[in-house]
Swiss-Prot record:
One of its GO terms (molecular function) is ATP binding. It catalyses: tRNA(Ser) + L-serine + ATP = L-seryl-tRNA(Ser) + AMP + diphosphate + H(+). One of its GO terms (biological process) is cytoplasmic translation. L-serine binds at T238, S239, E240, E294, T396. This is Serine--tRNA ligase, cytoplasmic. InterPro entries: aa-tRNA-synt_IIb, aa-tRNA-synth_II, aa-tRNA-synth_II/BPL/LPL, Ser-tRNA-ligase_type_1, Ser-tRNA-synth_1_N, SerRS_1_N_sf, SerRS_core, tRNA-bd_arm. ATP binds at R271, R272, E273, V287, E358, L359, V360, S361. It comes from Schizosaccharomyces pombe (strain 972 / ATCC 24843). NCBIfam families: serS. Homodimer. The tRNA molecule binds across the dimer. Coiled coil: none annotated.
Length: 450
């Protein structure tokens, strides 16, 4: 969440910066003034509580003097009891007001970076650059959709998957399994060579931890809840969630020596993905459970934009190594999630659909997450009014099922699928996977793309 001091002019803040950021997001601007008013009410309660504590101390001293002089202190004792009761009520009010205020602050998005294109329409996402392998024709005629290629490889079984697991359930089979595992292992090796620490994350988080790292609407729209007696846990939607909390409550006193910390997170991810998504619902492109390799970096605040560039470059190098055509797009302000100050997506080319689809999201969340999780940096100084928090950044490297879909469409031949060169060592040296099944009569490509 944002720094509460940013709302207070008298503390060096500038609430107009927050208002302008809210306008860019298409979000409520009036909430800024609501926080300012709530802060004043909270300060008033704190002031009253401090005065009550002073009164209690004064009365306590007077009682001591009366007792020492063996005089009647009954009236003072009654006053003390009354003040103590008042203190209790004020503490309850102050705690409730602070919680209410922080809940409102938490609903306000991060400050949108100046370089983000301002729009409420994702059609206005800005194309930063494109890349395609030299000598490769991006357009393919008479090709199959990724789910048809996987069917012909006998690489997955959606019918039995739905039978045992429900909507969008699937079994990966044979080369589907080996392709997926190859992407996982290659992704981890790729990041390990670039200084990342591999981290296999837990797939369930306690409710209080998830509340610090996920947006409120994610609880309703995206996350699966697991209830065990009185305990509530949530299945993770991305390893970013547990890894962001990995260093919660920690303080890096020597950031120049201790930061950055770079993690290659690996986990199965779970998303409810409510509703239909048209072509995205084909095959294993958009499913409820999938594997993902995630980049997560904690850095000194002054170096986070340098890290942002490095992370999107890593993602580009990964897909260049797979020789998949892609483009980088800057996401418009109105489509940013609350934590992100700026986001780039890498969209790869799917020839059957004839369009680019998102494979990577790379975000700089600045100190929005670390403030919630109390991950600080810098030398500890007595009386510091301004806390310094690390900056947190996240980027997909490879959501393996989705990346596999892209590989299948781009590497298909009339007789099977070529294996990308960088994956061949992870596929037992195989360079080509032959088709072993025919398509059903009502398959997608036989119906036409519409």
């Amino acid at each position: 969440m944002l720094d509460i001091n940013l709302f207070q002019v008298e503390k060096g803040g500038n609430p107009e910066i927050i208002r302008e950021s809210q306008r860019k997001r298409g979000a409520d601007v009036g909430v800024v003034d609501k926080v300012i008013e709530m802060y004043k009410e909270w300060v008033s309660l704190r002031f009253e509580l401090d005065n009550t504590n002073k009164s209690i101390n004064r009365v306590q001293k007077e009682i001591g003097l009366k007792m020492k002089a063996k005089e009647d202190a009954s009236e003072l004792l009654e006053e003390k009891n009354s003040l103590t009761e008042r203190k209790k009520n004020l503490i309850e009010q102050e705690t409730a007001k602070n919680k209410e205020m922080l809940n409102v602050v938490s609903s306000i998005g991060n400050i949108v970076h100046d370089s983000v294109p301002v729009s409420m329409d994702e059609d206005n996402n800005e194309i930063i650059r494109k890349w395609a392998p030299e000598g490769v024709t991006v357009e393919k005629k008479n090709c199959l959709s990724h789910h048809e290629v996987l069917t012909r490889l006998d690489g997955y079984d959606p019918e039995r998957g739905v039978k045992v697991s429900g909507h969008r359930g699937y079994f990966l089979r044979q080369y589907g399994v080996f392709f997926n595992l190859a992407l996982i292992q290659y992704g981890l090796d790729f990041l390990e060579k670039r200084g990342y620490i591999a981290l296999q994350a837990p797939t369930m988080l306690n409710k209080d931890v998830m509340a610090k790292t996920a947006q409120l609407e994610q609880f309703d729209e995206e996350l699966y809840k697991v209830i065990d007696g009185d305990e509530e846990r949530y299945l993770i939607a991305t390893s970013e969630q547990p890894i962001s909390a990995y260093h919660s409550g920690e303080w890096f006193e020597k950031p120049s020596e201790q930061l950055p910390l770079k993690y290659a997170g690996y986990s199965t991810c779970y998303r409810r993905e409510a509703g239909s998504h048209g072509r995205d619902a084909w095959g294993i492109f958009r499913v409820h459970a999938f594997e993902k390799i995630e980049q997560f970096v904690l850095t000194d605040p002054e170096k986070s934009w340098e890290a942002f560039t490095e992370m999107i470059n890593h993602a580009e190098d990964f897909y260049k190594s797979l020789e998949l055509p892609y483009r980088i797009v800057a996401i418009v302000s109105g489509a940013l999630n609350n934590a992100a100050a700026k986001k780039y997506d890498l969209e790869a080319w799917f020839p059957f659909q004839g369009e680019y689809k998102e494979l990577v999201s790379c975000s700089n969340c600045t100190d929005y997450q670390s403030r919630n999780l109390e991950i600080r940096c810098g030398v500890k100084k007595m009386g510091d009014r301004e806390k310094k928090y690390v900056h947190c950044l996240n980027s997909t490297l490879c959501a393996t099922e989705r990346a596999l879909c892209c590989i299948l469409e781009n590497y298909q031949t009339p007789d099977g699928v070529n294996v990308p060169k960088v994956l061949q060592p992870y596929m037992g040296g195989k360079t080509f996977l032959p088709f072993t099944k025919e398509l059903p009569k009502n398959s997608t490509s036989k119906k036409g793309k519409n």
